[in-house]
Amino acid sequence: GEEVILAKALMKDVLRHHVEVIEEFPGSDLVGRSYEPLFPDAVPRGESTTAWTVLAADWVTTTDGTGVVHTAVMYGEDDYNLGMEAGLPAHHTVGMDGAFVAGTHPELDGRYVKGCDEAIIGLLSAPGGSNGTGPSSGLLYREKDYLHDYPHCWRTDHPLLYYAMDSWFVRMTAVKENLLKFNDQVEWAPDWVGEGRFGEWLRNVKDWAISRERYWGTPLPVWRSESGEMKCIGSIKELQDEVAKAVAAGFANPECPDDVDLHRPVVDGFTLLSDSGEPMTREPFVMDCWFDSGCAPFAQWHHPFDEEQRFNASFPVDYICEGVDQTRGWFYTLLAVSATVFDDMAYKRCLSLGLILDAEGKKMSKSRGNIVDPWDHFNREGADATRWYMVTAGAPWNPMKFDPNGVRETYAKMFLTMWNVYKFHADYAALDGFDPEAQSVPVEDRSALDRWVLSRLHTVASQYHDNFTLSLIHI
């Protein structure tokens, strides 16, 4: 008969028939034990003594599965961290094209990984398993379809692969305490976003991978020699000086004028000189565009090269406002850059807006066809009616179901009423030749009703001012 090892709590969910429990033991007894791999040719046996070894990890649970999880070192953050800690081989079995690399298995080599499910099931189910040396019943005990979340490209809706690759990082973990300290000084609306969603993100902050293998973007200003010497360039003047040194040493270089284009491919053409006399070429990466966004408070003034007074007068900024999804975007990058560069907070107040959904509460998407073009309403009801509808629909931090009928209703009830009041006054004032400057009556001489209207106007204006200060724009 077959003998299988799995978590006791999952026996009823996994096993297909009545079984006899031969032995019970803690999972820790398996740690350090070796096992036969399902695809032994994927990683050469001589490459690592730690490959195909049982490890312990606190993220393996008994809520589903078998209590035993396969670790793919190069294809997931938890897997990678565990693999580096245990010294597992960092070996890619999938290329940048999403296909299995040569040597994985004759029937899988060169094939797109997401198109091989049936082939892999067939290989594991065959007598002897994937290489013919396993049990006659095959290596696959059971297969089961189930639903789970999986990342997809937001543009193409194609499935994505987590993929370990060489990158440049900002060591955000080194400034974690400062991030938390500066965040505590921000006046958040609502406060539970700053303490909860954003605060939790900061408490679990990871180092920031800022390099991207793209053509368009801000080039990483780092030059490296073959022996590993590096220079980081901080200005055009510094680049010009380094280019001049390289030219004097005999390295050919293009001109580097004051208005040099600092983007690819121009910037890639400069060869610099290392301190030991070696040629240095630029690291072929551009920066994460979110890094650009985080530099906005000083980049807008071309600081530190110009406008020091204007920068000092406007930093940290008084107020920012964006959707709640920016807790991992702009809210974070602003704070990350300012904490690492200036050792200071980036903004004093932040209003975190709820996301705008369609009338049925679903996320708007071009592929779903439920996008609302705001210009349709601007041209029909006007921008003010659209703005007033959104302001009064509810608390700004709550998700909003955008209903086009609501804009039309706001236009009819609010703005048409205001227009009719104005039109009534304007028509009769013109008919009577009314001149507000010449015929104005002092407030103290006006009727009680007129004075009450003025008092009520100033009271409402004061309340609105106070509520706007507290981001209670819906009250």
Label each region the model flagged.
Residues I473-I475:
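Conserved small/polar residues in nucleotide/adenosyl-binding loops
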Residues T218, Y347-C350, A426-V441:
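Short, glycine/acidic-rich hinge or "gate" loops at secondary-structure transitions
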Residues H302-H303, N398, A430, F434, ...:
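Short, flexible helix-adjacent loops and helix caps
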